A protein has these predicted regions:
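Short, intrinsically disordered or compositionally biased N-terminal tails of bacterial proteins
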Residues: 1-6
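Short, solvent-exposed loop/turn segments at secondary-structure boundaries
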Residues: 7, 81, 118-121
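Phosphate-coordinating loops and pocket residues in cytosolic domains that bind phosphorylated ligands
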Residues: 30, 38, 59, 108-109
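Alpha-helical structural segments
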Residues: 10, 14-21, 25, 39, ...
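Short hydrophobic/aromatic patch on the recognition helix
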Residues: 41-51
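Short secondary-structure transition hinges
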Residues: 95, 99-123
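Short helix/strand-capping hinge loops at secondary-structure junctions
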Residues: 22-35, 51
């Protein structure tokens, strides 16, 4: 892979990882793009090269959290003996995640108001 492409992916991942921590801790309203810049060590130009707005950063964070939630619940259900047990294990796994600060703040509290109800339902 081209070195510039690799650096771009790395920069984007760093922005998302930093914003994920900040949004989980302080919520969407309590997190500024300035704080994301400071904590990630990314330049303003690099941030806006990858994301058009704070909302776009949040959408990328939401997608990453949703991917992790789906993977975790799928792993929990993978060893089930039957479909009912798989549902029970997946749901229990989701409830455990939902009790955690990250999923509660990003997915359950902020997502519908930041990205809109329709997009939130599609996640």
């Amino acid at each position: 892979m081209n070195k510039n492409i690799e650096m771009g992916i790395s920069t984007r991942e760093r922005i998302v990882a930093t914003a994920r921590e900040l949004f989980a801790a302080a919520g969407y309203e309590g997190t500024s793009t300035e704080t994301v810049l400071e904590k990630s060590g990314i330049s303003r130009g690099a941030l806006y090269h990858h994301f058009a707005s704070k909302e776009a950063i949040f959408a990328a964070v939401l997608e990453a959290v949703e991917v992790d939630v789906a993977a975790t619940t799928a792993r929990a259900a993978a060893n089930a003996r039957d479909p009912v047990e798989a549902l029970r294990l997946a749901f229990a796994s989701f409830l455990d995640l939902a009790c955690g600060q990250e999923v509660r703040q990003i997915v359950l509290i902020d997502a519908h108001s930041v990205v809109g109800w329709q997009k939130w339902r599609e996640c």
